[in-house]
Amino acid sequence: MSSDAEMAIFGEAAPYLRKPEKERIEAQNRPFDSKKACFAMDDKEMYVKGMIQSRENDKVTVKTLDDRTLTLNSDQVFPMNPPKFDKIEDMAMMTHLHEPAVLYNLKERYAAWMIYTYSGLFCVTVNPYKWLPVYNPEVVTAYRGKKRQEAPPHIFSISDNAYQFMLTDRDNQSILITGESGAGKTVNTKRVIQYFATIAVTGEKKKEQQPGKMQGTLEDQIIQANPLLEAFGNAKTVRNDNSSRFGKFIRIHFGATGKLASADIETYLLEKSRVTFQLSSERSYHIFYQILSNKKPELIDLLLISTNPFDFPFVSQGEVTVASINDSEELLATDNAIDILGFSSEEKVGIYKLTGAVMHYGNMKFKQKQREEQAEPDGTEVADKAGYLMGLNSAEMLKGLCCPRVKVGNEYVTKGQNVQQVTNSVGALAKAVYEKMFLWMVTRINQQLDTKQPRQYFIGVLDIAGFEIFDFNSLEQLCINFTNEKLQQFFNHHMFVLEQEEYKKEGIEWEFIDFGMDLAACIELIEKPMGIFSILEEECMFPKATDTSFKNKLYDQHLGKSNNFQKPKPAKGKAEAHFSLVHYAGTVDYNIAGWLDKNKDPLNETVVGLYQKSSLKLLSFLFSNYAGAEAGDSGGSKKGGKKKGSSFQTVSAVFRENLNKLMTNLRSTHPHFVRCLIPNETKTPGVMDHYLVMHQLRCNGVLEGIRICRKGFPSRILYADFKQRYRILNASAIPEGQFIDSKNASEKLLSSIDVDREQYRFGHTKVFFKAGLLGLLEEMRDEKLVTLMTRTQAICRGYLMRVEFKKMMERRESIFCIQYNIRSFMNVKHWPWMNLFFKIKPLLKSAEAEREMATMKEDFERAKEELARSEARRKELEEKMVSLLQEKNDLQLQVQSETENLIDAEERCEGLIKSKIQLEAKVKELNERLEEEEEVNSDLVAKKRSLEDKCSSLKRDIDDLELTLTKVEKEKHATENKVKNLSEEMTALEENISKLTKEKKSLQEAHQQALDDLQVEEDKVNGLIKINVKLEQQTDDLEGSLEQEKKLRADLERIKKKLEGDLKLSQESIMDLENDKQQVEEKLKKKEFEISQLQTKIDDEQVHSLQLQKKIKELQARIEELEEEIEAERASRAKAEKQRSDLSRELEEISERLEEASGVTSAQVEMNKKREAEFQKLRRDLEEATLQHEATTAALRKKHADSVAELGEQIDNLQRVKQKLEKEKSELKMEIDDLASNIETVSKSKSNVERMCRTVEDQFNEIKAKDDQQTQLIHDLNMQKARLQTQNGELSHQLEEKESLISQLTKGKQALTQQLEELKRQLEEETKAKNALAHALQSSRHDCDLLREQYEEEQEGKAELQRALSKANSEVAQWRTKYETDAIQRTEELEEAKKKLAQRLQEAEENTEAVSSKCASLEKTKQRLQGEVDDLMLDLERTSTARAILDRKQRDLDKVLAEWKQKLDGSQAELEAAQKGSRSLSTEIFKMQNAYEEVVDQLETLRRENKNLQEEISDLTEQIAETGKHLQEVEKSKKQVEQEKSDLQVALEEVEASGSLEHEESKILRVQLELSQVKSELDRRVTEKDEEIEQLKRNSQRAAEAMQSMLDAEIRSRNDALRLKKKMEGDLNELEIQLGHSSRQVAETQKHLRTVQGQLKDSQLHLDDALRSNEDLKEQLAIVERRNGLLLEELEEMKAALEQTERTRRLSEQELLDASDRVQLLHSQNTSLINTKKKLEVDIAQCQAEVENSLQESRNAEEKAKKAITDAAMMAEELKKEQDTSAHLERMKKNLEQTVKDLQHRLDEAEQLALKGGKKQIQKLEARVRELESELDAEQKRGAEALKGAHKYERKVKELTYQAEEDRKNILRLQDLVDKLQAKVKAYKRQAEEAEEQANTQMSKCRRVQHELEEAEERADIAESQVNKLRAKSRDVGAQKMEE
């Protein structure tokens, strides 16, 4: 567990992820009684903590923490884990695994806000209901690249593990985030996406933003997709404020390097019913309330809405605000996400408009018409707003809602709707618009996230709506809960089955327990054939089905038969329920009201048609692919045998299909599970409801995991780890000094400990423990450590005290010695002779000391050099060791990948074998068909024979008829007429026969064409098979190279094991590895542990080397001190030289005195001898030390040489193993070639069978030709038979025969049509097989690319190792040169020192001469050895140069081969791409031609319509002009009236007093009012006409736009051709990349050569070591000789390889020629494609000219149509005539039959008369017969001529019928156009008539007004005259008054 310092990288999140170190220490030191601490069951809190007070029998008394005393059964009390397991991060590591331990661990971690906890393989998270700082950027950085055990539990850790697994295992991953609604799934999903977007950034430069667009990077877009989907797909529910009301599976795609490549989102089951209905405590989707928040006021104005949610019933049925959500800020985030995701401004406005329109839909009101069932709109204001936002005509929309058009049979009728039906229809349309808009947004986001970058793997994140139990549960809840049921079953199967499979894999005895089947009953109840969904879909098929019938069927089928289906028992006050299902998470009551309508999801097709024509592009696009009942009917009539179209799929069927796809995706990935828990129902932070959490734990499978832990062995440790950790429990069980396998050691260790054998099991690689045993072993280990530490401390203390005592004693003895010596010295200190001795002694010993110093210095320098060399060798070996370890690891990874590739290859081989079996089955079927054809042929031969028999019988009949001709003299004319009629009938029958034969021939030709097409497809399949074989050969080559790498890896394994000193055991492990994969894994892990031990040893050696380096430094310092002393000694020596001469004189004087005092000096001489003996002893010790040092160095050299020899032997062994494996590889290749030859033989046999089929068909055609000849013969016989028409009975017999022949031919025709259908079916099967082969080819190419990438990575790693080795060799060379230069310098210094010593010390001349002679002899031996070494080096250099030349040639050849192979592959790929492109271009050309013809037809119709419209416009303009003129006249009359009115007003002002004026004024006002009404009416009519003209203009504009869109389509096709060209250029770039790969392979071979050179350099180093020792030199010479032998063998092998490469070079040159031919072919095809492209462009340019030509052709076609109509009329008349003649012939036939009978009777009478009449009568009759015969011949000639004329006429009739058919088609097409135009003309005429009627009414009104105006004028004149009269009277009266 990490320390606080290590947790500092997590920043402020550290305390929320792992408990601090202080708390951990306190927990470990806390007093704990494991026998008393427990958990007890409690009714209130489920489980409580307590202490056991007592136990009696099966009863336990427990005292809880709140001072309660409980008496419980023993099975209700559970032991508590030690304190160190408190808040443990992985609950599977607990000592005691049970429910209360899991519950309290989660609770305590939740109380500390550690919301993530591991539970074995998956992670459990608890919703905190508050923000925690655990998702900050520093946390993301801290978790990056961390293993699971290295960091605390977190969703980031799960994500990073999935990412690392994806990169290492090269497998797709998935993260399944499941839990109940409100558990925090959506938040965790966002965090996972945040993590991937942060750690796997693409690394590309940001794209330049387009003006007007704010488009982010791929990471930003992936992150911003979530807010947008949440706004439109999340809503507040009872349990969750931000509940996802749809499921999503987000796939994040990565490239081969782990960088983000792209992403896509799949959504499931959007809850669209929430758009129109919410419960009281819920609300609709967030986007509605975000818009209403008024954060963007422009949206309020744009959508014509208010800011009050209660104004819109669709969004205000529940709550409208959520405390935890700021709708204003969320709106800005949503708007920003739309911009970042690249939506255009038009699309953005369309989204908002449709959202506002959905809100307006809820305000639309309808009412019932009086006395009718019909509904009508209650106001149109809301509909106008909705229509404006959706780009619709509101009146048409309301009409479509109230009176939709329904198809009844083949006609459309208008159906009346009541208010409820209209309301339901409005809600369904609102839901459909919202759902389709949401799905379109998802598709649009996927388009934006698809960057077209290469992607290798993906990580899928699943966020599905959680399990839901509401008061009212409908179909949506059933689908959601069923999804969770399936996911839970997947989880159970994956977690528990894998756990048990590991037991079986490890070889543990285990009875398999299937936990995954616990949910099968509920799943089958829902989805089985007679399950709930099946019954629901069946009911939807019946038109009269109701919810009640659906419920009754459910009860009949499941009630009482399935335990999971129950009758509900709803509590009072809750919603009604119809049935209950027992899910894994609880029992749910479902209400089936409206399920049938929800499942069928019907829409008002009339309104949908308006949507398709909407001016809002987004809305029209959403419903462009909608197919209603009409489309369904038409589709059904065409393809009645197929399934219903997608538009007829029910909601449940679509849901199940998507769910099955999801489960398939999940099964193909490696899943990682995250289980989200709800702590409480009140959303209170920090509070945990025990019952609720336990219910979820039981449902989510956490407790099942505990159950399998109880039964199984949850704790497991590798054998090596167990041995290392628990060896302390009984060290004597594992003997020291000898190697013992970790498994055996673990078995011995456990058997020696007092542990129950049932508590553990031994696997192949691990030891498994029951729950709790590992904790017991830990306690035993702690106790053992305590005792050992106590004992060790006592021993250490005793040892330290003994050392201290020993030092004290040594100090005491040394003090005594010093005291004695000082006393003795003080006694002789002042003795004269002592002074003399002090002076002479240094002089005597100085020369000898100098010699000793020189020798010591030489020895020191030599030892120093040897130490440096040994250090260099040690470092080199260490580097080699590291490189070998690295290569071993790389090869292990490569072996894993190779085994996977081998498995893939085996699977592909099995697939080929299966395809072979299928081909054999097809061959068998063809043989059976051949037999059937032979049977048909035999039947035809039999029929032919029967016809021949019939012909012979007819001939006989004809002979009989010729005999009877002489007897029909009197009835000649009648018989001739009858013969003519019958001959015409026969010709008609023969024509029918000829028609049937022609049809038969046409069917045979179609049959032959189908067979030819089948042959072509089979040839294509054979070509694909050959290509597949080539690719498989390439993959075999790659696999061979990878197998070589495997061999190298195995060899390196053996080298490593030899270095470890256990070669025999390693070889056995290798054999086990080849026999058993599981043992391989165990041995690998064991060896990895041993490698770690070796690594520790190497570390120890490094530490030792550091110590030696320190000693070397100390010795260097000592040497410097000694050199300083030598310098001081030299100075003193110079002084001594001066004093020597003085002393020599004094010596002569003293010698005389010494002779006198010889007795005194004898004691002194003895002392000198003693001192010399001591000095000699010290010298001997020094020499022994130097000899010992040399011996150790020699031993080290010998050991190193032995190790090198062993390595050489190992390399030899590896070479032999490599050869053996290459032989095996060649054998495998031979087997593969055999398989390929078998496949070729099968294909050849298939072609032979097809050839036989063709020959049989040729025979069949020949037989048919013969049959035709026979029919011709029959025709001739029938012509002969026409002469003899007197025998009615035989004629009728022939007619019957003809009818039977016709029936047989029709049967044959039916058989041929059946064969044709069978051939078509086979052709479809062949195309499917071809597609499957193409898919397999694509997958094999993909595998090949993967293998190539792996090979390149391995080669790069190998290159790095080679670079490291070359670096080490260069360092060795540097050391060698340094050593040689240092040696030369030091020899020169020695010679100078020797000269100085010779000059200064004459006494040492003899010694120096001896030393010099010795040095000379050593120099001679050195030179001799150096010469031998040089010779050997020359030999080695020659061999190495030869080998280098051969290697270089080999590399060049390999490079050429690789280049040409790659070019060949690239050319093949280019050829295939070009062929595909040519085929696609041909199809596009064909499509363009068809489109062109359609455009011509449309243009022709549009021109005619345009012409008609222009004529109508001209008519309308004339009418408008006339009305304008009329208006001008009215205006003039109006002005006149106004003028007169003004005059009248002036007159009226004068006579206001008069009462009659008021009456006149009222009349005038009425006149003015009528005039204004007339004017307004005329203005309105004019505006309506203007609008109609505008509408016509818009229609013509739309037609022009349609033409423009077609031209745009042509431009797009041209762009597609350019894109194809770019794709081909990209293929060329890929070929260049492959060329680069081949160059890298060449570099890798060069690196291999460098390794060989490195080995040669190693041999040179061994030769250098031989200079220092004669024995070492001999051994190394022997090694070099052996190596030379090996090199000679290798040279021979290289020569053989050179010959082989020469052969391969010739083959490659031939392949090069073929490839160049193919390249030229591709180039020519490319140029032809470019030419075709130019031609297409020219054709497009000529389209406009051809359009005008087509107009002329259309006029000609009209004339032809008229002619065809007349011809058709004539043909109809002729047909009628022919029918009349046939009826007449029928009547004649009946008459002839009667006359034949009469003639027969008369003939009999004539025969009797002839017998009686005699010879004269016979002669007369004979003459008469002759005349009749001549007349008959003439009549036959005339009949033949008539037949010829009839045939000619028939041919003419056929030609006319064919032309009439073509003309009829043209006429029909023209008639359709005419009908359309006539309908339009009628409409326009109707409008014109209405306009004329209105104009007439206006004119009548105008005339009436004019008439009234004239009357008013007359009245005004009368009034004026009266006024004048009154004025005159008034003047008279005034005059009279004046006069008076």
Curated annotation (Swiss-Prot):
IQ domain mapped to chain residues: 785-814
Residue numbers binding ATP: G179, E180, S181, G182, A183, G184, K185, T186
Coiled coil: 843-1940
Top-level taxon: Eukaryota
One biological process term in Gene Ontology: muscle contraction
Compartment(s) where it occurs, according to its Swiss-Prot or TrEMBL record: Cytoplasm, Myofibril
Pfam annotation, one family: Myosin_head
Domain Myosin motor intervals: 86-782
Domain spans labelled Myosin N-terminal SH3-like: 33-82
Residue ranges of the region described as Disordered: 1886-1940
Record keywords: Actin-binding, ATP-binding, Calmodulin-binding, Coiled coil, Cytoplasm, Methylation, Motor protein, Muscle protein, Myosin, Nucleotide-binding, Thick filament
Principal cellular location given in the protein's record: cytoplasm
Record field: compositional bias (Basic and acidic residues): 1929-1940
GO CC field: cytoplasm; myofibril; myosin filament; myosin II complex
Domain comment, as recorded: The rodlike tail sequence is highly repetitive, showing cycles of a 28-residue repeat pattern composed of 4 heptapeptides, characteristic for alpha-helical coiled coils.
Subunit structure: Muscle myosin is a hexameric protein that consists of 2 heavy chain subunits (MHC), 2 alkali light chain subunits (MLC) and 2 regulatory light chain subunits (MLC-2).
Protein name as it appears in the record: Myosin-13
Organism of origin: Canis lupus familiaris (Dog)
